[in-house]
A protein has these predicted regions:
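Membrane-embedded catalytic cores of phosphoryl/pyrophosphoryl-handling enzymes
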Residues: 71-155
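Hydrophobic alpha-helical bundle signature of multipass membrane enzymes
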Residues: 1-80, 89-101, 111-115
Length: 155
């Protein structure tokens, strides 16, 4: 099941996003960092005032994929789900990919397509392994968009 690969690579994508955007434009990097911070403050507001949880299915299989899902469940508690920070960060990468320009149009387009595919995989994997529901995905996107609007006003 490919969702495991997406989770490992997600952290690389999130970090790489800031490195690349910082190399492209300092002002844009500052906006994205501030937008990210502000969007997480929005998430914290929801986590404190409107805590959410999710009842996950019992994983009874003994195969490697079942063991991996049990491991993910053990390190990622089913609380503070709305908005999804996994999806927020992935959406941040998509938005950044459309703001950055690499040396060639081919590289720029390759990065954009790779980022979209990776991020959509992360969105799907959080749903398919029962870490989030669809509202959490859209909540993460909305939180980031609001954070970016505020960041553009402040910077």
């Amino acid at each position: 099941t490919p969702f495991v690969i997406f989770y490992v690579l997600a952290y690389v994508q999130w970090a790489l996003n800031y490195i690349l955007i910082g190399r492209d434009s300092k002002k844009l990097c500052y906006q994205f960092v501030l937008g990210d911070i502000l969007s997480k403050v929005i998430c914290l507001f929801f986590f404190i005032l409107f805590p959410t949880t999710l009842t996950r299915p019992e994983i009874t299989g003994t195969d490697i994929f079942s063991q991996l899902v049990r491991f993910i469940y053990s390190v990622d508690a089913p609380v503070n789900l709305f908005p999804s920070i996994h999806c927020l960060e992935s959406w941040c990468c998509i938005r950044a990919a459309y703001k950055m320009n690499f040396k060639t149009e081919k590289r720029t387009n390759y990065y954009r397509v790779a980022t979209i595919l990776m991020s959509l995989g992360i969105f799907a994997s959080t749903l398919f392994i029962k870490q989030h529901v669809i509202a959490d995905v859209f909540g993460g996107i909305a939180a980031f968009e609001i954070g970016m609007i505020l960041a553009k006003i402040l910077i």
